[in-house]
């Protein structure tokens, strides 16, 4: 079964053809990242305009790369939530039009579910398992009970891990995206040079990163006021350690308490080298099995949408003609 996956939740316009939820036949991405760099972050208006300009060509290229046309597609899967509402609407409306024009079933896909599904593409992972989903907008610990059933065990109370890393990178004067820049420079610094706070929370699996973000801002401002040279690499390494240690500690507690031995990472921050290394160390120590998405599938892409779309489709999920886009949507809410 071939699924055409369409993704437009942020600044990547992406489409892919995926067979049986596991085999990627094509994967095409057009990004407006370079434009957003000029502003130090994603500008929703620019993202939406670039989606509108690119989506038709991206879908055509994905079909061509897979050596098929719409007659060879069994269903169209499209990201409908969460994300930038204007960006999402471009993908949803394009997919709805294509579905009606070709009489092809349409399947709505939750963005975070598709990030989880990136692991299905690159390995033999099957539910049940515990997944740490970390991105610029979300930080969740999710029990994946089957391919379409999820239970959120913990989530961030404030900033997401990716957001905190990006803002710290910007504070340190590093190029956008800040999280990627921190990951690149951190190996040249001393990760024990600065101690960043680990917040106490009354819920055992939740996260809070606003305190870490405030701490690095205060350190930078204090040193600048004194005219001191910023030890950028040390600050980057220490901040990255603070964020990733918090993520791994909460993941370990949730896995231990709930008895999970199959662990996965997902989302853009799952590409972070220290997070991957420390999670691997934890799983080796505990004798758990770790599943990591390939780096090319960590960021937003159409292949992960096609993968999750397959499992939603075979479970009977179909979009109604009035399918809309939503800026927010819990991952554990049933899909229609």
Predicted regions: what they are:
Residues 2-82, 111, 115:
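N-terminal beta-alpha supersecondary unit
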Residues 78-102, 273-282:
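Short Gly/Thr/Asp-enriched flexible loops that form oxyanion-binding sites at enzyme active sites
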Residues 108-109, 263, 280-304:
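Conserved phosphate-binding/catalytic loops in two-lobed NTP-binding clefts
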């Amino acid at each position: 079964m071939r699924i055409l996956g369409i993704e437009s939740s942020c600044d990547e316009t992406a489409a892919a053809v995926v067979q049986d939820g596991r085999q990627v036949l094509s994967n095409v991405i057009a990004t407006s990242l370079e434009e957003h760099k000029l502003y130090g972050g994603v500008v929703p208006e620019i993202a939406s305009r670039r989606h509108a300009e690119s989506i038709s060509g991206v879908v055509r290229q994905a079909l061509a790369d897979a050596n098929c046309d719409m007659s060879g597609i069994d269903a169209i899967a499209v990201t409908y939530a969460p994300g930038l509402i204007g960006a999402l609407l471009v993908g949803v409306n394009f997919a709805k039009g294509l579905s009606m024009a070709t009489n092809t079933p349409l399947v709505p896909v939750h963005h975070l579910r598709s990030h989880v599904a990136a692991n299905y593409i690159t390995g033999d992972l099957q539910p049940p398992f515990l997944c740490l989903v970390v991105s610029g907008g979300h930080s969740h610990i999710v029990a994946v009970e089957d391919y379409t059933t999820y239970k959120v065990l913990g989530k961030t109370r404030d900033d997401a891990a990716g957001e905190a890393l990006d803002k710290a990178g910007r504070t340190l004067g590093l190029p956008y995206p800040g999280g990627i820049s921190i990951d690149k420079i951190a190996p040249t610094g001393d990760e024990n040079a600065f101690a960043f706070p680990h917040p106490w929370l009354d819920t055992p699996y939740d996260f809070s990163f606003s305190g870490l973000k405030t701490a690095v801002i205060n350190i930078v401002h204090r040193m600048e006021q004194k005219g001191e040279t910023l030890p950028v690499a040390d600050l980057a390494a220490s901040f990255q350690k603070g964020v990733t240690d918090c993520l791994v500690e909460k993941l370990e507690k949730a896995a231990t308490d709930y008895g999970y031995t199959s662990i996965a990472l997902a989302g853009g921050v799952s590409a972070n080298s220290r997070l991957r290394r420390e999670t691997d160390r934890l799983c080796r120590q505990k004798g758990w099995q770790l599943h990591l998405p390939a780096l090319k599938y960590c960021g937003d892409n159409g292949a992960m949408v096609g993968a999750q779309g397959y499992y939603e489709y075979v479970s009977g999920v179909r979009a109604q003609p009035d399918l809309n886009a939503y800026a927010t949507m819990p991952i554990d809410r049933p899909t229609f």
